[in-house]
Amino acid sequence: MRIVPFGAAREVTGSAHLLLAGGRRVLLDCGMFQGKEEARNHAPFGFDPKEVDAVLLTHAHLDHVGRLPKLFREGYRGPVYATRATVLLMEIVLEDALKVMDEPFFGPEDVEEALGHLRPLEYGEWLRLGALSLAFGQAGHLPGSAFVVAQGEGRTLVYSGDLGNREKDVLPDPSLPPLADLVLAEGTYGDRPHRPYRETVREFLEILEKTLSQGGKVLIPTFAVERAQEILYVLYTHGHRLPRAPIYLDSPMAGRVLSLYPRLVRYFSEEVQAHFLQGKNPFRPAGLEVVEHTEASKALNRAPGPMVVLAGSGMLAGGRILHHLKHGLSDPRNALVFVGYQPQGGLGAEIIARPPAVRILGEEVPLRASVHTLGGFSGHAGQDELLDWLQGEPRVVLVHGEEEKLLALGKLLALRGQEVSLARFGEGVPV
């Protein structure tokens, strides 16, 4: 049994790992490269898609599923296994990707082909491919997110996918993996633990209360899948503590995900399930309006506060949030709240550095609004959670992280006696 990384090797995006065992070739994830690595989506995979026997997808984020249509474009015609929640979310995610790609590397016919080959596989169900057996475990990162267990040739491999932050309320905690000979593990936040979630929520509510009380707008850049809905859940469960104000979900894609959530109840935490069992939707706080059309979005810029606006893109790479920032950052009554990762060199990181003004959509905008960064909302496991999950002293190969963060985690694993290395693109690792 061997595992060969073809993405997310000493980087965060592009997850794709080829498992070779029992005469079978199984691809674990097929993710898009993003940010400065985007051009690599046009490059060959590094293996022949026509020779792959099956694909397993851990969750519906683009950096794990975004090259799947390209795989079909280049000749793959086999099954694609994912949990039912991932299957349903992928239709939204891949169709949206078609609209936002600057230089498309697949077309609508490839998306249709890929979606037609999806096969649901639930947690704990074993998939048999000859002498190879595979199953999903709960990863707690998105509804339906999973890690993969692969057994064959007398060896066991675990691939973490993306592991969730276990302090959060919306999703179940990640399950512990079985004993394994090798774990291919993510290390997105391998260099630090997260701030406690309860403290993060408390600070978030204080920002909202202050800003709304003075008639301001709270501008929240959000990811359309999971993070936007999580913030809505916080507003639902704590809204009674806040001044009354409209809440605008200014993201049609996030709105589609929101509409899907009642069909995914069993993938949420027991706390969330309890709300649904009482006939309530805890992702729809009082005063919520989903903004579908561009003209309605622009009208929010002219409307007075108080209000809460959630809009994409979460990393300010484009989208409606840029118009809200262009019109809102110059008003000292307003607040900009980052609840997700902001990459170095991006507009978000520039704003966090608090210059007197920033350039948005071709205009210099004075930065007078308050700016807040709340890292405790992260959807990834922090360093302490990763160390806990990797108990049992398996050999570990680290993926899905910037090199310095993987090195920091690797050092701690080595200090407790575990054999650890960092993945290299195209270099196979024996299990």
From Swiss-Prot:
<keyword id="KW-0694">RNA-binding</keyword>
<feature type="binding site">
    <location>
        <position position="162"/>
    </location>
    <ligand>
        <name>Zn(2+) 2</name>
    </ligand>
</feature>
<feature type="binding site">
    <location>
        <position position="63"/>
    </location>
    <ligand>
        <name>Zn(2+) 2</name>
    </ligand>
</feature>
<dbReference type="InterPro" id="IPR001279">
    <property type="entry name" value="Metallo-B-lactamas"/>
</dbReference>
<dbReference type="GO" id="GO:0003723">
    <property type="term" value="F:RNA binding"/>
</dbReference>
<feature type="binding site">
    <location>
        <position position="141"/>
    </location>
    <ligand>
        <name>Zn(2+) 1</name>
    </ligand>
</feature>
<comment type="function">
    <text>Has endoribonuclease activity towards 23S and 16S rRNA (in vitro).</text>
</comment>
<dbReference type="GO" id="GO:0005737">
    <property type="term" value="C:cytoplasm"/>
</dbReference>
<protein>
    <recommendedName>
        <fullName>Ribonuclease TTHA0252</fullName>
        <ecNumber>3.1.-.-</ecNumber>
    </recommendedName>
</protein>
<feature type="binding site">
    <location>
        <position position="64"/>
    </location>
    <ligand>
        <name>Zn(2+) 2</name>
    </ligand>
</feature>
<feature type="binding site">
    <location>
        <position position="59"/>
    </location>
    <ligand>
        <name>Zn(2+) 1</name>
    </ligand>
</feature>
<keyword id="KW-0479">Metal-binding</keyword>
<dbReference type="Pfam" id="PF10996">
    <property type="entry name" value="Beta-Casp"/>
</dbReference>
<feature type="binding site">
    <location>
        <position position="61"/>
    </location>
    <ligand>
        <name>Zn(2+) 1</name>
    </ligand>
</feature>
<keyword id="KW-0255">Endonuclease</keyword>
<feature type="binding site">
    <location>
        <position position="400"/>
    </location>
    <ligand>
        <name>Zn(2+) 2</name>
    </ligand>
</feature>
<comment type="similarity">
    <text>Belongs to the metallo-beta-lactamase superfamily. RNA-metabolizing metallo-beta-lactamase-like family.</text>
</comment>
<keyword id="KW-0540">Nuclease</keyword>
<dbReference type="GO" id="GO:0006364">
    <property type="term" value="P:rRNA processing"/>
</dbReference>
<dbReference type="InterPro" id="IPR011108">
    <property type="entry name" value="RMMBL"/>
</dbReference>
<dbReference type="GO" id="GO:0004521">
    <property type="term" value="F:RNA endonuclease activity"/>
</dbReference>
<dbReference type="InterPro" id="IPR050698">
    <property type="entry name" value="MBL"/>
</dbReference>
<keyword id="KW-0378">Hydrolase</keyword>
<keyword id="KW-0698">rRNA processing</keyword>
<comment type="subunit">
    <text>Monomer.</text>
</comment>
<dbReference type="GO" id="GO:0046872">
    <property type="term" value="F:metal ion binding"/>
</dbReference>
<keyword id="KW-0963">Cytoplasm</keyword>
<dbReference type="InterPro" id="IPR022712">
    <property type="entry name" value="Beta_Casp"/>
</dbReference>
<dbReference type="Pfam" id="PF00753">
    <property type="entry name" value="Lactamase_B"/>
</dbReference>
<dbReference type="Pfam" id="PF07521">
    <property type="entry name" value="RMMBL"/>
</dbReference>
<dbReference type="InterPro" id="IPR036866">
    <property type="entry name" value="RibonucZ/Hydroxyglut_hydro"/>
</dbReference>
<feature type="binding site">
    <location>
        <position position="162"/>
    </location>
    <ligand>
        <name>Zn(2+) 1</name>
    </ligand>
</feature>
<keyword id="KW-0862">Zinc</keyword>
